[in-house]
């Protein structure tokens, strides 16, 4: 009986299915840019993904504790670097570079004319005025006014004078005949004729 049982057990074992083997999983394809080790080898199309930053060290032999790494050893205390050629300093348009505080800025704006220059009036000049000819005028008795013309200067023109009737008490004690050419430097004097019952007297009044 024991022999029959063993034979039956052997047959069952031989007829039984073989044990299942462990299958290895197939590799899942992943994009090249997402792999952890591709940052330093294969650049991404964007050129900014998974890129390792370069470590830039101090190229100097020694650096003190209190010395900043961005400060050059040849930098001056005023934060100015030395000139590349000390015999011929750098320049812009032929001018030497100086400190901004010592540089005198040039004013290129249009300047007005100085006050000591005589500026002639714009416009057409009459031929008689250009030649200095005094135009004829009516007598004072008929025109009702007295006109005295300055005879000096290229722009000599008749200056009208006001008429003061007889009986006034503001007649000057002495006659002042000082006249100035129009456009000259100094006060412009207008000669006013004062008519009195006895004689004609002139007075110059200065205006600013």
From Swiss-Prot:
Q: Does the keyword Signal apply?
A: yes
| Assigned keywords, A-Z | Signal
The region annotated as signal peptide is 1-16
Q: Which residues form a coiled coil?
A: none
Q: Which organism is it from?
A: Mycobacterium tuberculosis (strain ATCC 25618 / H37Rv)
Q: Where is the composition biased (Basic and acidic residues)?
A: 32-43, 55-95
Where do the record's region annotations for Disordered lie?
Answer: 1-95, 145-176
Q: What is the lineage of its organism?
A: Bacteria, Bacillati, Actinomycetota, Actinomycetes, Mycobacteriales
Q: Where is the composition biased (Polar residues)?
A: 148-158, 167-176
Task: Report what the protein is called.
Answer: Uncharacterized protein Rv2306c
Locations of Basic residues compositional bias?
Answer: 44-54
Q: Name one GO cellular component term.
A: plasma membrane
Q: Where is the composition biased (Low complexity)?
A: 16-25
